UniProtKB/Swiss-Prot annotation:
Keyword presence, Ribonucleoprotein: yes
Keyword Isomerase: no
MF term (GO), any: transferase activity
Identification of the protein by name: Large ribosomal subunit protein uL2
Assembly description: Part of the 50S ribosomal subunit. Forms a bridge to the 30S subunit in the 70S ribosome.
Coiled coil: none
Protein purpose: One of the primary rRNA binding proteins. Required for association of the 30S and 50S subunits to form the 70S ribosome, for tRNA binding and peptide bond formation. It has been suggested to have peptidyltransferase activity; this is somewhat controversial. Makes several contacts with the 16S rRNA in the 70S ribosome.
HAMAP family: Ribosomal_uL2_B (MF_01320_B)
Family, as annotated: Belongs to the universal ribosomal protein uL2 family.
Domain of life: Bacteria
One Pfam family cited in the UniProt record for this chain: Ribosomal_L2_C
Native organism: Pseudomonas putida (strain ATCC 47054 / DSM 6125 / CFBP 8728 / NCIMB 11950 / KT2440)
């Protein structure tokens, strides 16, 4: 994987920084594992905007990624290829199991075409193998972690993400997440060894607004640039700073206000994130 800084041959190329991976598959995705992906433009069934800054973008197919891997225990799989996935920041790996079935998984860092992976309690401690947390050594780096047994991976799925298993006590294990949060998870839950691929994703620079539009992201307008009818920071004579602590268009505090409201699982958090 290489970081390529483009030459300023035009204003749109001047600030472009690309992440180039020559191992990525250049052809079409595996057809049985793709589905139609319709765009909402950020609107709900009433046609009203419920998510701002969404709309347009290139047509995409959704890749069906296996986040569970619990029904292939003990069946070895060969990595056929590593692919780009427009639906996530991480790359995906196409596995061919010994029984002939093919599935996509989140590609772990260091895994390449031809590698052998396996899931299950007897799987060796090797990047890309999937085990229950009770069978993973303390101190291991993991990703694709379940919060409920059998539900599928929910934590550490984006590019370069990982967590560390730091303790095991009774039916729970303790994880340290990248955010600094330490939380307990049932030892029956599964995780994949290693960290997620494409860790250089954060180093890229799109270089121009149009590249963001290709990805379906619309502009973000500042509140102080609006009229009073549109935003609490709007209006005023000349340029103003908003005149109050930063709030959302609906008046709720932004920039640091705590939004977590799931009291039911508070007892699972040993230490809040930094």
């Amino acid at each position: 994987m290489a970081i390529v800084k483009c030459k300023p041959t035009s204003p749109g190329r001047r600030f472009v920084v690309k992440v180039v991976n020559k191992e990525l598959h250049k052809g079409a995705p595996h057809a049985p594992l793709i589905e139609k992906k319709s765009k909402s433009g950020g609107r709900n069934n009433n046609g009203r905007i419920t998510t701002r800054h969404v709309g347009g973008g290139h047509k995409q197919h959704y890749r069906l990624v296996d986040f569970r891997r619990n029904d292939k225990d003990g069946i070895p799989a060969t990595v056929e290829r590593i692919e780009y996935d427009p639906n996530r920041t991480a790359h995906i790996a196409l596995l061919c199991y010994a029984d002939g079935e093919r599935r996509y998984i989140i590609a772990p860092k260091g895994v390449s075409a031809g590698d052998q992976l396996i899931a299950g309690a007897l799987a060796p401690i090797k990047a890309g193998n999937s085990l229950q947390l009770r069978n993973i050594p303390v101190g291991s780096t993991i990703h694709g972690i379940e919060l409920k047994p059998g539900k599928g991976a929910q934590i550490a799925r984006s590019a370069g993400a990982s967590a560390q298993l730091i303790a095991r006590e009774g039916v729970y294990v303790t994880l340290r997440l990248r955010s600094g949060e330490m939380r307990k998870v049932l030892a029956e839950c599964r995780a994949t060894l290693g960290e997620v691929s494409n860790s250089e994703h954060s180093l890229r620079s799109l270089g121009k607004a149009g590249a963001k539009r290709w990805r379906g992201v619309r502009p973000t307008v500042r509140g102080v640039a609006m009229n009073p009818v549109d935003h609490p920071h709007g209006g005023g004579e000349g340029r103003t700073s908003g005149g109050r602590h930063p709030v959302s268009p609906w008046g709720f505090p932004t920039k640091g206000a705590k939004t977590r409201g799931n009291k039911r699982t508070d007892n699972m958090i040993v230490r809040r994130r930094k």
